[in-house]
């Protein structure tokens, strides 16, 4: 957890430093960052068991519990191998859901990112004007967390599809700068 906090702090200083030269530093996609993200995804599985018990979610299902704002800032952890998203407030897991990430030919990037922009309803400029409700962009080339079809395997063009009700709740608690940690 300390290594993850250090990586997030480094990312924050990169964002601050690059703001001066107008180059968004939204991500750490280094090997080390990818390993940190994978560790965070592994820990999230353990935290889910402790927080919610031995629940098995079907595609489109989610769990959400109230956690006081005073617990700390939010962060999103994505496990690509499990096709799951986890939401923390501080060190407390508050939510978990099934997802659909990028297909093999359009993979979701792994590493440590932050939300760059939020749009309640966006339409894809790349994919036939496809709707992207509750879009939270974490990558400058249009990859986002958003409401979309959640099946049993990866099926997106790189985005992270979330169940609609979950995406709406997540959109309501995050802000630009919220960390998005994506591990294998």
Regions found by a protein language model. Give the residues of each.
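N-terminal pre-domains immediately preceding structured catalytic cores
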Residues: 2-134, 141-184
């Amino acid at each position: 957890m300390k290594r993850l906090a250090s990586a997030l702090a480094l990312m924050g200083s990169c964002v601050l430093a690059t703001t001066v030269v107008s180059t968004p530093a939204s991500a750490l996609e280094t090997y080390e960052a990818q390993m940190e993200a994978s560790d965070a995804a592994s820990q999230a599985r353990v935290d889910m068991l402790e927080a919610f018990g031995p629940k098995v979610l079907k595609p489109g299902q989610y769990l959400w519990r109230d956690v006081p704002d005073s617990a700390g800032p939010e962060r999103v952890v994505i496990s690509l191998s499990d096709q799951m998203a986890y939401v923390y407030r501080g060190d407390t897991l508050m939510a978990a859901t099934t997802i659909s990430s990028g297909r093999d030919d359009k993979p979701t990037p792994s590493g440590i990112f932050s939300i760059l922009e939020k749009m309640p309803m966006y339409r894809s400029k790349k994919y036939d004007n496809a709707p992207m409700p509750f879009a939270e962009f974490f990558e400058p080339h249009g990859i986002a967390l958003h409401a979309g079809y959640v099946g049993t395997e990866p099926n997106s063009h790189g985005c992270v599809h979330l169940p609609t009700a979950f995406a709406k709740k997540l959109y309501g608690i995050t802000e630009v700068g919220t960390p998005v940690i994506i591990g294998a």
